[in-house]
Amino acid sequence: LEGQEFFDKLLEELNVKYLAFQEDLAKIPKTGPFILVANHPLGALDGVIMCKILSEIRPDFKVMANFLLTKIEPMAPYVISVNPFEGRKEAYSSMSGMREALRHLSEGNCLGIFPAGEVSNKNNEFHEILDKEWESTALKLIKKANVPVVPMYFHAKNSKFFYSASKIHPDLQTLLLPSEMVNK
């Protein structure tokens, strides 16, 4: 399976249902470059849903996401990979992803990003499920690209256990993401 067939089958197998309002979809530019910015409450599933929705409207859509998604062959054409596990933000694989993203936009295409760079959690002063502050690299990309920015919001959350575990150690959050994906 590939493209829309892949996204449809994956979401069906995971029993994931989502709602996208037509009046919001109508605001997505049909031509020209833009950056779609979104919160990141679920993990990989956000990227899958984003690709499903946007690639129906814009076949040139790609998302900047975890390089592991490119290991899923039908996802690879939609992903500009970055490595969120690097200690140094300036590491080569993420910088090459940044260059690829800018090239993709300069060719008139559209790009989705999760500017916080990691999945939302409750480890904040409000004890609410929130994205952390946007990564400086995301802000630099937006500024350097100088294209319209379109917001997308996922109204979703992971399990209570996920948020509790992330308080114990942040890496537990990462380890639990695959199980969260299949338990929606």
What are these regions (language model features)?
Residues 97-107:
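Short amphipathic alpha-helices and their capping/turn segments at secondary-structure boundaries
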Residues 53, 103, 140-141:
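Hydrophobic/aromatic ligand-binding patch that stacks against planar heteroaromatic rings
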Residues 35-91:
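Catalytic core of membrane glycerolipid acyltransferases/transacylases, capturing the structured
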Residues 107-118:
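A structural motif
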Residues 88-98, 130-136:
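Active-site glycine-rich loop that binds ribose-phosphate moieties when present
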Residues 1-37, 47-49, 56-58, 76-77:
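Membrane-anchoring hydrophobic helices of lipid-metabolizing enzymes
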Residues 110, 122-184:
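A cross-family acyltransferase "interaction/gating" segment
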Residues 47-49, 74-76, 115-116, 122-127, ...:
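A short secondary-structure junction signal
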